[in-house]
Amino acid sequence: EVLTGGYYEVGVHIPEGIYTVEAQDGESAIYLIDDENGIYIWQQIGNDPENPNQAAVMDDLRLYDGALLEVKSGAALQFRSDCAQTERLHGETNPLQDSVRVEVGQTMTAGRDFPEGLYNVKSEPDWNDLMMTLPDSFLSEFAADEERRVEVISFAPKELELSYENVPIPKGTEIQTTGAAVTLEPSEKIGSTDYGEFYKE
């Protein structure tokens, strides 16, 4: 299985299993969050011999159902497993069908201008940041009065850095783009429909 930049829920977008991961070309990184099993991993993956923090191949990556895997943009990563539980995939077809285009200078709000949901974000070929300002309910109790929580996804004019898969956009989130228009395309498969759960502390 080949994954590019984006978020992947184990059991929905990739089967549970023990994987070997290798960059096909370029450099990337993975971030694994598995609260149930207490597994938290950040690992750079690529073929730069001068980067001591980077692994050419990562072995024995254990992905358990319900864990969240983030693949950073920059390279396509090959995930190989001899024990992937493909028969246990339980994602549902995304009920959303319509794509949403956001132009530079435009602000669009999930739940008002387009439905909340799980989207693949595609950028026009330019340097670009997608700014997602979350509702105040996602602020921590220690946040300053005027503070807003902003999540940023960056794009670059390279083939593997112009999209980010399976981005949760909960109701009330304001979407802006800084350098080029983006298109929000509904992801093929979804797990939980609590799209805000991803951003809860």
Residue ranges and their predicted role:
Residues 1, 25-103, 123-201:
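Primarily secretory-pathway and cell-envelope proteins
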